[in-house]
């Protein structure tokens, strides 16, 4: 059995890790940590949880002794500091600390420094793109939720060199759980119910992450226009991406079918079939569709994921499975909750 620790177990992504790993056939949870609830049992904090383990303070020596892999679900800068103290343990960070090739970009967007950061020691954890590198990685930077939805939708065209990198417009809509558990009037029921709003327009922290990975896929430095929105639902992301390509709609469809044909979690829909976030609720699945606006010669890509599963904790477990040579869908072969 793989001994697993979760640091930050009482946030939304931490709880989702507990939910998934509790039912994983090859895992034993040996350490749970929470800064806010240290000393309490998890099911005292959340009575619906089936785990009665005590939430502990972070103890690097104890974690190193009792864990083979640790998931960190912590604020920017904190995961990196803790990870450096852990010995002979593999790390999957659900924050941003291990996502960037250039620490200066991270510092610019997150206003944090990562002392002695070595980008060659970590792997960006979008499983479908980097599984071969993930296999032997010690540090994996789990992708952000928006980047996951956008990169999955654009990777085949970018890698094929069939996308005009000069014009990429991304419109994404997310459930409010993507903002985490922090208290804010902006995320209250009275502000969100029956409403839709854009936020962090042109300055969302996921922009440099998307640009980094998209540039690597196409081999050219590119920039995109990204506008995220909050919608009055708990889970789910729907991204609509507008791009230019010389390929016909049928050619794009065949390219995507071939690219993702062997993937267990990525589903390419026929043109004219458009996905709903409800199709992914509580699951690690992603659906991608496409349309062509012949009048403006624009290709429209649409992707949906559950932001807490494929966009966070589910993908983290998928990465763990790859790192430990398990079946990639181990612990993740559950269907979406519908309706």
UniProtKB/Swiss-Prot annotation:
Pathway: Amino-acid biosynthesis; L-arginine biosynthesis; N(2)-acetyl-L-ornithine from L-glutamate: step 3/4. It is an enzyme of class 1 (oxidoreductase). It comes from the Bacteria. Gene3D superfamilies: Dihydrodipicolinate Reductase, domain 2 (3.30.360.10), NAD(P)-binding Rossmann-like Domain (3.40.50.720). It is found in: Cytoplasm. It catalyses: N-acetyl-L-glutamate 5-semialdehyde + phosphate + NADP(+) = N-acetyl-L-glutamyl 5-phosphate + NADPH + H(+). GO terms for cellular component: cytoplasm. One of its GO terms (molecular function) is NAD binding. Its main location: cytoplasm. The active site is at residue 145. GO terms for biological process: L-arginine biosynthetic process. Keywords: Amino-acid biosynthesis, Arginine biosynthesis, Cytoplasm, NADP, Oxidoreductase. Its EC number is 1.2.1.38. Belongs to the NAGSA dehydrogenase family. Type 1 subfamily. Catalyzes the NADPH-dependent reduction of N-acetyl-5-glutamyl phosphate to yield N-acetyl-L-glutamate 5-semialdehyde. This is N-acetyl-gamma-glutamyl-phosphate reductase. The gene is argC.
């Amino acid at each position: 059995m793989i001994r697993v620790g979760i640091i930050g177990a009482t946030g939304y992504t931490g709880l989702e890790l507990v939910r998934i790993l509790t039912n994983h056939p090859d895992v034993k949870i040996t350490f749970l940590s929470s800064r806010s609830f240290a000393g309490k049992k998890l099911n005292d904090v959340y009575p619906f949880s089936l785990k009665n383990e005590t939430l502990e303070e972070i103890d690097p020596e104890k974690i190193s002794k009792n864990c083979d892999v640790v998931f960190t679900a912590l604020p920017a800068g904190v995961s990196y500091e803790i990870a450096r103290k852990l010995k002979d343990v593999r790390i999957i960070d659900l924050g941003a600390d291990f996502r960037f090739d250039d620490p200066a970009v991270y510092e610019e967007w997150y206003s944090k420094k990562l002392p002695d950061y070595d980008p060659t020691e970590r792997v960006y954890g979008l499983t479908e793109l980097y599984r071969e590198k993930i296999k032997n990685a010690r540090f994996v930077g789990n992708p952000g939720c928006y980047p996951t939805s956008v990169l999955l939708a654009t990777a085949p065209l970018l890698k094929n060199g069939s996308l005009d990198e000069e014009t990429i417009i991304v419109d994404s809509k997310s459930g409010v759980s993507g903002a985490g558990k922090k208290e804010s009037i902006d995320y209250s029921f009275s502000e969100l119910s029956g409403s839709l709003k854009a936020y962090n327009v042109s300055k969302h922290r996921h922009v440099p992450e998307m640009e980094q990975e998209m540039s690597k896929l196409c081999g050219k430095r590119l920039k995109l226009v990204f506008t995220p929105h909050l919608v009055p639902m708990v889970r789910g992301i729907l991204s609509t991406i507008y791009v230019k390509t010389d390929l016909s709609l049928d050619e794009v469809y065949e390219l995507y079918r071939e690219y993702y044909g062997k993937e267990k979690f990525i589903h390419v829909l026929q043109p004219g079939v458009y996905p709903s976030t409800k199709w992914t609720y509580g699951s690690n699945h992603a659906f991608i569709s496409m349309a062509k606006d012949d009048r403006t010669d624009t290709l429209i890509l649409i992707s949906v994921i559950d932001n807490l599963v494929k966009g966070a904790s589910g993908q983290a477990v998928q990465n763990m499975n790859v790192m430990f040579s398990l079946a990639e869908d181990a612990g993740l072969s559950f269907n979406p909750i519908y309706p």
